[in-house]
Amino acid sequence: MHNGSPIIRRKSTRVYVGKVPIGDGAPIAVQSMTNTKTTDVDATVAQIKALERVGVDIVRVSIPTMDAAEAFKLIKQQSTVPLVADIHFDYRIALKVAEYGVDCLRINPGNIGNESRIREVVACARDYNIPIRIGINGGSLEKDIQEKYGEPTPEALLESAMRHVDILDRLNFDQFKVSVKASDVFLAVNSYRLLAKQINNPLHLGITEAGGARSGSVKSAIGLGLLLSEGIGDTLRISLAADPVEEVKVGFDILKSLRIRARGINFIACPTCSRQEFDVIGTVNALEQRLEDLITPMDVSIIGCVVNGPGEALVSTIGVTGARNHSGFYEDGVRQKERFDNKAMIDQLEAKIRAKASILDANNRIVINQLDDNK
């Protein structure tokens, strides 16, 4: 029920990864990456499907060998979400997966080889109508750039990116997006800021190698939050040393927090104190798990007492305000006569939320999972 985001998006060109539009005002796409052995087709497909269930828009798959490229052919046949091939060192792998229907090629300028190899990749991408991501990483810059700057700096990442943007420009190839990732928040943020002033191509955001689930989520929220709040970014990936499913959840949580792209429930819950009249923490944890399948955007406030509860409920789709034995229930900001038994609240709230989601879905107020222009 809150107003939409006040953020003005940076203007960019449009590319498509499969049917997913990227840039030029398209919704910011959430990406993740498999961490299985790509040659283990069953495990990789299972992980891709798990990512699809939590709403991923695009999945990147590492293709380190020709054997992995052959496995990718089978993986692609069993996947519906667009797949990006992550290519390092051997440009010929990019040519092979293009034959097998890959939706985007990610190349690392720091190790893909000389310009003649890039020309071959670009020619192949043009033939198959596949976009490319120029993926700059602070940990794998070209040797001459490392020697020039001594260490990764925003200027170093920018120079690497612009060197390869210029190559694609000379080849008259404009179907590409760019990333300038680093594990340091300020290095990444300042690199993206510089790049955003130089080009109008879509930008893929990420704090690379951010860390474990907790620390990596915090780093990513700070770094990507800064950039997104400035209107910078067209796709994102949260890089965690954790289950890739968590990357997708955190990515949507960041977009949801900035009101850039709503998907699923935005829980508003108090941290609790001695005033709470019911188990707020247990209620929120249970509902987050039970309602993971819902993608209907709505704000749900769960507040343990009457200090802030009524005020939050007024701007929530569904709200509950703690009171002794039975708590107040709000829908669309209006207090209802019905009250919730504090001991049975979880089941009651779940039922109310699901019923409300069905109504909103029927009214076409749902944000679709896949960002397909044809939908």
UniProtKB/Swiss-Prot annotation:
Pfam families: GcpE (PF04551). Pathway: Isoprenoid biosynthesis; isopentenyl diphosphate biosynthesis via DXP pathway; isopentenyl diphosphate from 1-deoxy-D-xylulose 5-phosphate: step 5/6. It comes from Yersinia pestis (strain Pestoides F). GO terms for molecular function: 4 iron, 4 sulfur cluster binding; 4-hydroxy-3-methylbut-2-en-1-yl diphosphate synthase activity (ferredoxin); 4-hydroxy-3-methylbut-2-enyl-diphosphate synthase activity (flavodoxin); iron ion binding. Converts 2C-methyl-D-erythritol 2,4-cyclodiphosphate (ME-2,4cPP) into 1-hydroxy-2-methyl-2-(E)-butenyl 4-diphosphate. It catalyses: (2E)-4-hydroxy-3-methylbut-2-enyl diphosphate + oxidized [flavodoxin] + H2O + 2 H(+) = 2-C-methyl-D-erythritol 2,4-cyclic diphosphate + reduced [flavodoxin]. It is an enzyme of class 1 (oxidoreductase). Its cofactor is [4Fe-4S] cluster. Belongs to the IspG family. The keyword Iron applies. The lineage of its organism: Bacteria, Pseudomonadati, Pseudomonadota, Gammaproteobacteria, Enterobacterales. [4Fe-4S] cluster binds at C270, C273, C305, E312. SUPFAM superfamilies: Enolase C-terminal domain-like, Nitrite and sulphite reductase 4Fe-4S domain-like. This is 4-hydroxy-3-methylbut-2-en-1-yl diphosphate synthase (flavodoxin). GO terms for biological process: isopentenyl diphosphate biosynthetic process, methylerythritol 4-phosphate pathway; terpenoid biosynthetic process. InterPro entries: Dihydropteroate_synth-like_sf, Enolase-like_C_sf, IspG_bac, IspG_bac-typ, NO2/SO3_Rdtase_4Fe4S_sf. PANTHER family: 4-HYDROXY-3-METHYLBUT-2-EN-1-YL DIPHOSPHATE SYNTHASE, 4-HYDROXY-3-METHYLBUT-2-EN-1-YL DIPHOSPHATE SYNTHASE (FERREDOXIN), CHLOROPLASTIC. Its EC number is 1.17.7.3. Binds 1 [4Fe-4S] cluster. The keyword Kinase does not apply. Keywords: 4Fe-4S, Iron, Iron-sulfur, Isoprene biosynthesis, Metal-binding, Oxidoreductase.
